[in-house]
Amino acid sequence: MADLDSPQKLSGVPRPPDGVGGGSCSEISTELIRSLTDLQELEAVYERLCGEEKVVERELDALLEQQNTIESKMVTLHRMGPNLQLIEGDAKQLAGMITFTCNLAENVSSKVRQLDLAKNRLYQAIQRADDILDLKFCMDGVQTALRNEDYEQAAAHIHRYLCLDKSVIELSRQGKEGSMIDANLKLLQEAEQRLKAIVTEKFAVATKEGDLPQVERFFKIFPLLGLHEEGLSKFSEYLCKQVASKAEENLLLVLGTDMSDRRAAVIFADTLTLLFEGIARIVETHQPIVETYYGPGRLYTLIKYLQVECDRQVEKVVDKFIKQRDYRQQFRHVQSNLMRNSTSEKIEPRELDPILTEVTLMNARSELYLRFLRKRISSDFEVGDSMASEEVKQEHQKCLDKLLNNCLLSCTMQELIGLYITMEEYFMRETVNKAVALDTYEKGQLTSSMVDDVFYIVKKCIGRALSSSSIDCLCAMINLATTELESDFRDVLCHKLRMGFPATTLQDIQRGVTSAVSIMHSSLQQGKFDTKGIESTDEAKLSFLVTLNNVEVCSENISTLKKTLESDCTKLFSQGIGGEQAQAKFDSCLSDLAAVSGKFRDLLQEGLTELNSTAIKPQVQPWINTFLSVSHNIEEEEFSDYEANDPWVQQFILNLEQQMAEFKAGLSPVIYDSLTSLMTSLVAVELEKVVLKSTFNRLGGLQFDKELRSLIAYLTTVTTWTIRDKFARLSQMATILNLERVTEILDYWGANSGPLTWRLTPAEVRQVLALRIDFRSEDIKRLRL
């Protein structure tokens, strides 16, 4: 029996999905139907055919539904027919025109190419003819100019000949007139050699006679003959002789200068200045000539030759300076003195002062001169390198750096500055030590003399290094000054503070009549009253206070010095001195200097803490302890009496005022304010201790609140620091002691506290509540805090 489920056996193709027609033919062939004999198979085929019929009917219905749309589109297409025929005709006509234009353009462009080729050949022919004529003209012109000794004109003809295209001349030699051209070339070459010899000879004569107009005349001819390097070399040689002659003349004047002369102390710096100004004047005068006749980029060559001569003359001047000023011997002497345990006789710092000033002036003049050269050469290179590659520009920059950084002038100045730094260190250290040793105090002044003297010396040394225009030198001196202030000078002040603020006999007298009588009785037994001890103690107290002022002024002076250096060096960097690396080095040195200011502030704080501990605390504690002797378990009558005759706080305020008056007169406002802040902190801490040892009733708590308010009001007037924060705990204790009943604390605690931040812990609150004798301990314990 046939397999009806197999499409291959029924039709040989897969069955399509429902709704998709298979065309006008059934998938089941007639032969298949005829071959079927089984009823079930026939019924299956019948059902299949019925299904296909339904699909075909649906497709026909769908097509019939589209009939109107299709017919309307067909009508539209019929209407478009004539237009499409017109478009077809226009397109064919346009294609014909494009083809014609293309052919025409091709013909025209080929003719243009032919014309362009002919034009180029014509130009070449004209150029060749012009070159031949130029060659003849140059030959005739150079002969005439040489006969008339018109060397400029002769050089112009030779220059024109040298600029001719050699390939064109070579082609001309191969033509019919080759022999004539060869003859002309030979004559021109002979004239060229002859003119070179004449110009060289005439230039030598002019330089020998010192005839500057003639020297410049023939100097301008060299580049026309292609002798750029030779011209610059010979002209530089002439200029170097002028520089050497003037420098030797100036050096002779130096050696003959009387030491009483106004400029005798800086005569060598003046000599270098004259040398540098002379070379700068030469560069300014002849730069236009070099740029005009030799072209941009050639000034470097001229300056390179001049710098060699400058180095020779600088070496002579510096040698004379070292010898006459005994510079190296002074350095060795200083070096020996700087060594620890040195037994050699110390050199007087004043002897070094003029030498150090002259060295920095010499270096400053050198730096200014080198900056001038760098600026001139750089601007000349920029013009010449406008179209050059980056590699060429970098190579020129390397040449410039090498010339200025490695010249003998730079090396010599670096050596002098190296010795200068050591000598300046010695000058600063010895002068600072002398200022400390000669320290004096004038009555009415807050500081002693050494602070102003020391910072005058430090500023002078750093300022002198700054005047050298060398960032390395300046940074070295800032570092040395930082070390001197941080170590040596700070140690002096630290030692004075560590001696402490003495507890004097007069203080003992103030503490009570009993101790005063005892001291006087002891003194009378010895037959005298020891006023010297009192005087020396007063001096020690004054010394301590003055030292505190000195420390504070030192910190401020260092900060001011840092700001001044920042301002001054901004000007230096804006002038092109140094670079990013130098700027970073300078900033690092200033950071170290600023750190020293912080160390002086730390030392000041240590001194204030010492003063507070030794001079204020021993006095304040007994005054506060008298609070315990005043009862705060009082009745209405006592409360009223306390209001009329205050038992404690007014006397305490008076004692504080009297004690702090001594310090107010002897300390700067800033230090006094800081000391007052420490004193208020001490009062707050000590008063809290005695309050916790006292007992109160309701009126006693109210009395304590009044006393505390009076104390806070007074302390607020004597300092700019915040007082209320320091007395916050005491104020909260006063609030607690003022409560009418224990549970009233809950109105101020927790969620009910509002903006109030409690400084007391729950345990401390209970402790303060327990100070009220009228509060039961059971009620306090029951509180939930």
Curated annotation (Swiss-Prot):
It is found in: Cytoplasm, Cytosol; Golgi apparatus membrane. Residues 618-740 are annotated as: D domain. Residues 1-25 are annotated as: Disordered. Its main location: cytoplasm. Residues 741-785 are annotated as: E domain. Required for normal Golgi function. Plays a role in SNARE-pin assembly and Golgi-to-ER retrograde transport via its interaction with SCFD1. This is Conserved oligomeric Golgi complex subunit 4.
